Amino acid sequence: YRMIVLERRAYDNTKALIDFAQGRSEVDTALGDNASELLRIRKCIEDVASLSQFALDSLVIMASCSPEGAYSLNRRLSADRSEAVRKYLGDFVPEEWKDSLKVSVLPENWEQLEKLVSNDTVMTGDAVRKILDVIRNMKDPDVAERKLAGFPEYRYMREKLYPKLRSVKFDFHLHR
């Protein structure tokens, strides 16, 4: 005979770049590429819902912000955006999933910023090292943001890198 091990728990995730107006949390399907991103997320939800061998334990929705602005305000903004996306998607999930939609917050996505800066091909090596030094030795995110704002590369970072930090992650926790 042959033994097959089936894991009881399963996990899947995806990330969407959902645009929000500055300082706002409303889901606007007409803003940026939101319509196609939200459609992609809805398709992902449909695909997971169609997996008859799995049941959903939770779908955790976590919105993250870029570092500009006070950390405390970004915490509130992240929570408000996560909740707005949860409410929006509530109309598109199976009825039995509605209570399984959870929200989480990531006020400022410094880990992703570190990756983006490390992999950037526009900024010079010296600038990258200085920026990474600020990020990696950060004790207070608001102080770190003020230090970054003093660098000549800050405008580039705000225009090209920071928008990539404003994302929403979807974690599907499932079981057999």
Identify the meaning behind each predicted range.
Residues 13-15, 54-56, 98, 165-167:
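Extracytoplasmic
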